[in-house]
Amino acid sequence: MQNKNSMLFRSGKNLLVYGLMFIMLSIAVDWYRKPSEPNAFAQQVFYDLQQQPKVIAQLSHQKPMLLYFWGSWCNYCKFTSPAVQQLMDDKVAVLSVALKSGDPQQVADYLNQENYHFPVINDPDGEISKSWDIQATPTILIIKDGKVVQHTTGLTSYWGLKVRLWLSSLT
């Protein structure tokens, strides 16, 4: 009986160690891939696919907003985009950038096909993403009062984003 408990304790300890190593590795990768904010980005006017002006400073003034860099060709984005859409449905301010996903009509067709309704700035040549030093998709920035307060790259969940938004609202 004691041998069984000892083995169970050892397994739990190993699981904890591997879990902590995974978290530390994820943090290190996020730090390495940290985007660079372009000068005066918060005041810059962007136009979405419907030609509606979007200003990050205004969108992030009342509460944190999500800036989501994605691509229609990105496999991880296929798992992250539904979470972003769900946050949009929850009334979170979302602005997204479609990186090298085609002309505006191709991006609009993709959004309709996937039933996504978040506002999209098309970045067909990657110039906007390059100005932010985006190295991977998906990349998600949480911006509050015109300042990037959190970021993450790669696969993430609705609840992971929800917690990050909540933590950002506390500062």
What are these regions (language model features)?
Residues 62-64, 90-93, 118:
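Loop/turn elements at helix/coil->beta-strand transitions in domains of secreted/extracellular proteins
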Residues 78-114, 124-130:
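Structural microenvironment flanking redox-active thiols in thiol-disulfide oxidoreductases
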Residues 40, 63, 135-137:
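Short, small/polar residue-rich loop motifs at catalytic or cofactor-binding pockets
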Residues 66-67, 94, 140:
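Hydrophobic beta-strand anchors of alpha/beta hydrolase catalytic cores
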